[in-house]
């Protein structure tokens, strides 16, 4: 019983911390993901690779100038 209570309290604390941290970083990660998707869409349309993706090796087409 004591172990169960400790586990539940730990989960609640971790969940609260996650939401406090995710409030800022999660939103930023989501924007970064959307930005990366738009870069990939741009890459397919233009036939060139944005510099940031070219450097990471995410695409093998010509780098955009």
From Swiss-Prot:
PTM remark: Contains 2 disulfide bonds.
The entry's keywords: Disulfide bond, Ion channel impairing toxin, Neurotoxin, Secreted, Signal, Toxin
Main location: secreted
Annotated signal sequence range: 1-22
Tissue: Expressed by the venom duct.
Cellular component terms per the entry's GO annotation: extracellular region
Organism domain of life: Eukaryota
Keyword Metal-binding attached: no
Family the entry assigns: Belongs to the conotoxin O1 superfamily.
Function: Probable neurotoxin with unknown target. Possibly targets ion channels.
Domain comment as written in the entry: The cysteine framework is I (CC-C-C). Alpha9/4 pattern.
Protein name: Conotoxin Cal1.2
Organism per entry: Californiconus californicus
């Amino acid at each position: 019983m004591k172990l169960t209570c400790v586990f539940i309290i730990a989960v609640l604390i971790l969940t609260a911390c996650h939401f406090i941290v995710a409030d800022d970083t999660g939103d930023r990660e989501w924007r970064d993901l959307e930005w990366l998707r738009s870069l990939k869409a741009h890459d397919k349309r233009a036939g060139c690779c944005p510099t940031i993706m070219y450097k990471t090796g995410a695409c093998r087409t010509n780098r955009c100038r």
